[in-house]
């Protein structure tokens, strides 16, 4: 029967291994190596050596923070302001000298844009607003004062 299996294995490309080819010394199998009870030493590396290499990072990079100041004349300028917000740039808008209806439409459009972009809008004075994207935090006493007066109840 083993000859038949050997022929099948040879045909398939496998080699049949006879167990008789391996001879073990009985003495080697019966002897056990002595195991020493030594504590295992573990070494952890947290990468702190590389962090302490003293790298110098230039804080004056080519990307500077830009704030846009805009004085829209018509409702069509509101889309340009919204594009600045989409590019993560805060905008100060001055609505002085524009008709009240157009100013209200611009603020309504920008308020919706700010909400959609998860930004914030703050009133600085009667006709001046700061509109900031979500990566800019606007803080100050005036913000808290305006929130208490509920000028913009949806403001953060």
Curated annotation (Swiss-Prot):
Question: What keywords is this UniProt entry annotated with?
Answer: Cell cycle, Cell division, Cytoplasm, Septation
- Has the keyword Cell division been applied to this entry? yes
Question: GO:BP terms for this protein?
Answer: division septum assembly; FtsZ-dependent cytokinesis
Q: Name one Pfam family in it.
A: SepF
Q: Where are the transmembrane segments?
A: none
Q: Which domain of life is it from?
A: Bacteria
Q: What are the annotated GO cellular component locations?
A: cytoplasm
Location of this chain's protein in the cell: Cytoplasm
Q: Could you tell me which Gene3D superfamilies the record lists for this protein?
A: SepF-like protein (3.30.110.150)
Q: What does this protein do?
A: Cell division protein that is part of the divisome complex and is recruited early to the Z-ring. Probably stimulates Z-ring formation, perhaps through the cross-linking of FtsZ protofilaments. Its function overlaps with FtsA.
Q: Which family does it belong to?
A: Belongs to the SepF family.
PANTHER family, A to Z: CELL DIVISION PROTEIN SEPF
Subunit annotation: Homodimer. Interacts with FtsZ.
This one is known as Cell division protein SepF
Q: Which organism's genome codes for this protein?
A: Ruminiclostridium cellulolyticum (strain ATCC 35319 / DSM 5812 / JCM 6584 / H10)
The primary gene name is sepF
């Amino acid at each position: 029967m083993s000859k038949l299996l050997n022929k099948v294995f040879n045909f398939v490309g496998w080699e049949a291994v006879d167990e008789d080819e391996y001879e073990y010394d009985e003495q080697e199998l019966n002897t056990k190596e002595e195991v020493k009870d030594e504590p295992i030493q573990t070494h952890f590396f947290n990468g702190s050596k590389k962090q302490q290499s003293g790298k110098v990072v230039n804080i004056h990079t080519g990307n500077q923070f830009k704030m846009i100041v805009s004085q829209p004349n018509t409702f069509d300028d509101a889309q340009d302001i919204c594009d600045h917000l989409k590019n993560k740039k805060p905008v100060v808008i001055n609505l002085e000298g524009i008709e009240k209806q157009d100013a209200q439409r611009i603020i309504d459009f920008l308020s919706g844009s700010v909400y959609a972009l998860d930004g914030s809008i703050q009133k600085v004075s009667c006709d001046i607003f700061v509109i900031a994207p979500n990566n800019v935090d606007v803080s100050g006493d005036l913000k808290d004062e305006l929130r208490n007066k509920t000028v913009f109840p949806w403001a953060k």
